[in-house]
Amino acid sequence: MTPAAGLGLKPQHYDEALAATAPGLWFEVHPENYMSAGGPRLTVLTAIRTRHPLSLHGVGLSLAADADPDPEHLQALKTLVDRFEPFVVSEHLAWSTHRGLHQPDLLPFPRTHAALSRIAGNIGRMQDALGRQVLVENP
């Protein structure tokens, strides 16, 4: 099936997503909501994936932070990518961590050569960890 129209998947829409039959329909999910060893969310996502393509769109990797991406986050993301085989993996280009503290927001980054170099390195580390190209979205 060629993906044609996508919807953001939220738990309150699970029943409709499971019943949907439109050709070309795909769903975008935030991988951070599915980074667990099991549970009902993964069960439902597995059922949806048997019927529709998925896109994983991350919001928590903090690619513009002043540190490398969290290796545990990258490993959890890799586990989801391997399990669900999304046709697209993307991540927000922002920062949300600083000195080990997590901010519950996508914060802007300075538009400097140093920031660009750091971001390019972090995108490279993400792609290397996942073994595939990724898309980035500016907040």
Describe every region a protein language model picked out:
Residues 3-12, 61-68, 108-114:
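Active-site mouth loops of central-metabolism enzymes
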Residues 14-15, 31-43, 62-72:
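Acidic-and-aromatic substrate-binding clefts and catalytic sites of carbohydrate-active enzymes
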Residues 16-22, 39-56, 72-87, 124-129:
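Acidic (Asp/Glu)-rich catalytic clusters
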Residues 51, 58-69, 84, 93:
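Structured, acidic catalytic/metal-binding patches in enzyme active sites
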Residues 6-36:
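N-terminal ordered "arm"
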Residues 3-9, 25-29, 54-57, 89-91, ...:
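Hydrophobic faces of well-ordered beta-strands that scaffold small-molecule active sites
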Residues 10-12, 30-34, 59-62, 93-94, ...:
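Active-site beta-loop-alpha junctions enriched in small/polar residues
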